Each structure stands twice: as C-alpha cells, then as structure tokens.
Regions:
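Electropositive, gly/pro-rich neighborhoods at or near active sites that engage anionic ligands
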Residues: 1-130
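Short glycine-rich anion-binding loops that position phosphate/pyrophosphate groups of nucleotides
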Residues: 33, 171-173
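Residues at the C-termini of beta-strands that transition into short coil/loop
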Residues: 77, 136-139, 194
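Redox- and metal-dependent alpha/beta enzyme cores, enriched for Fe-S-associated oxidoreductases
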Residues: 112-154
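Glycine-rich phosphate-binding loop signature in dinucleotide/nucleotide-binding domains
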Residues: 157-162
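Short catalytic-loop micro-motif centered on adjacent basic/acidic residues
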Residues: 165-169
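C-terminal functional extensions of proteins
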Residues: 173-221
C-alpha cells in the first residue's frame, strides 16, 4: 500500500501547477540503476531494460549529483540499492507519477499534458500517446551510445517563442539529458518519466504495471 507523506502530496501539487501554468522546471530521477552506474559495482552488467552501466555515464551521473542542483531530483522510496546519503540534494519522491498511476490512474496528468506542447523522447512504442505533439524516436536501450546526436536533435526542437514540455523515457541517460538540456535552456520543462506510460500503450515492463486498475480509462491501442 502506498502511503504518501505531506511532502509527497505537496510535491505532486507543485509540479502539476507548474505543468498547468507552463512554469519551467526539471525533474530528474535517481534509482538503483543510476547508483549502480555511479558505483560501477556491476561494470559488465545491465539493468532491467538492457541498458549497460557505462563507466563514462556513471562519471557524468556522479558529477551531476555531486553538486547541489537547482531542479528537482527524485529518489525511490522503495528499499533498493542507493548511495543517496553520500550526496546532498533536496530529495523528492522519484516515483510520484508511478505511484499516482497505481493509486488512481493518470487521467489528470493526461489532461494536463493535453493542454501543453509535449515533445516525447522514447522508443517507438510510446509514439501513440495522445498528448504527444512531437516525437523523437530513440532505441529501446543503450541510447548513451548515441548521446550527442540525440541531444542535438532535442535541442533543435527548442523554440524561443513557445514553452515546450520535454518528456524523456531514455533509461539512465535521462539524468544527463535533462541536466544538459536545463543548463542549455531554462525556458522549458524537462521530465524523466521513465516507464510510467508503458502500460498506457499496452506494455507491462514493471511488476507494479500488472496491478494497475485504471489504464483502460485513459488510452487503449
């Protein structure tokens, strides 16, 4: 059972307000995969999506997390591998959207995203999401191999005349993407949404996806 703290509820309310009002922000999410990449505890391993724990990716992630950032950085509430205590950040709940999906569905989030200009960066299966205005297709895993090209493609979507909300499903590289994009242009919103929308395109890639009761209320293939 999910029990949100007062801080969790306030955080969700705050970012939903910012989405609605098109106030720029960035939301980065550090989970066990990011920490394993940083620690290089499994240098030849891969995460659940087949993404490699690249040493140079781990180095970038550590550089980012070692400095206090001016954007939201999330940490999982679940009991998983973490190095959080070694890094000073104003940690928020990284799974706030995932937990909302499990608790009541994402109807409200879909409505919010339908009201703004969304650029989605993800694998081909996510392109049918109904709120997407522009889509950048990336591989199902290991986008880090083509990081610079993808970053430039995303930057080319930035338009000084319109606020855009960039949603990224790009594995552990997400945290580097949103960091570099935020520091390139702080007039847009950049969110690591992870796998939260997978069930809404018919893909159950996480164990909690099998428990969802509200997916069909929003979108069906």
């Amino acid at each position: 059972m999910i029990n949100w703290t007062k801080k969790d509820k306030e955080f969700l309310y705050e970012i939903c307000e910012k989405l609605r009002d098109q106030v720029p922000f960035t939301f980065s999410r550090f989970g066990d995969g990011e920490w394993l990449a940083i620690s290089q505890a499994q240098p030849d391993g891969i995460n659940c999506d087949g993404n490699k724990y690249y040493a140079d990716l781990g180095k970038r992630l550590e550089e980012i997390i070692s400095k206090k950032q001016d954007y939201y950085i999330g940490h999982q509430n679940v009991n998983a591998y973490t190095l959080r205590k070694d890094y000073l950040q104003d940690w928020v709940n990284s799974d706030i959207f995932h937990e909302l999906s499990e608790m009541q569905g994402l109807d409200y989030i879909f409505d919010l995203l339908n009201s703004v200009h969304v650029v989605y960066i993800g694998n081909e299966s996510l392109s049918p999401l109904p709120f997407v205005d522009e889509f950048i297709e990336i591989p199902y895993n290991n986008v880090w191999d083509d990081y610079d090209n993808v970053l430039n493609e995303i930057k080319n979507k930035i338009n000084d005349n319109i606020h855009k909300t960039f949603l990224l499903s790009a594995g552990m590289a997400c945290e580097v993407f949103v960091h570099d994009l935020w520091n390139f242009n702080k007039n847009n919103t950049y969110i690591d949404v992870g796998s939260v929308f997978d069930p809404y395109v018919g893909k159950k890639t996480r164990s909690y996806h099998h428990r969802l009761q509200h997916v069909s209320n929003i979108f069906q293939l």
